[in-house]
Amino acid sequence: MGNCMAVEFPPRLFVTGTDTGVGKSYVSALLAVGLTATYWKPVQSGAETDADWLRCVTGLPAERLWPESYLLRAPLSPHEAARREGVQIAMGSFALPDCKRLVVEGAGGVMVPLNDKHLMIDLIAELALPVLVVARSELGTINHTLLTLQQLRQRDCSILGVVVNGPANEANCRAIAEYGKVRVLAEIDQRVDLSPANTAALFERYFGANG
């Protein structure tokens, strides 16, 4: 189902997830179109990039797809993909694009390693953007989502809310909202394919008009 109230998004935000494959890129595509924002994935591992997919399904112009800071070939955790290529992912090397509206997508979940000392949550904290968490709707999501929220709060990250992706599960959404003390912004279903023709309408359906 969609969201009963329009969501007020900040001009720049970070999209993370409870796991890999939970729908971060899908949500990022909706936001990039709906908010007329630039998309940036600082660390990409895997030959097929999320930016390429996002361009195909949204039709975003090239100037709104910011180049990755680290583009790694192997579809592995960033620290391992970088190790195999002899690359060191360095904290402090990530400069936010100079644009008014920005959607930043993380790799994997918040505890994914970037190098021998740093995790994805270190990058989230360094960039200091409000965070939107994408979670699955299925069994196991309550635990994964609450742990993710806990880690973000321990680092004093500002949490916008949670987007739940998958078959409708009102009980899990209620539990996430209650125990996580967080707003579930929307329930979405990425089984609905995105295209340049429908992405804006799906953003309106799930999130309403942005103030």
What are these regions (language model features)?
Residues 1-15:
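Extreme N-terminal, non-catalytic leader segments
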Residues 9-12, 26-88, 93-96, 100:
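N-terminal phosphate/diphosphate-binding loop that engages ATP/GTP or pyrophosphate donors
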Residues 58, 127, 179-182:
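Short, structured coil segments at secondary-structure junctions
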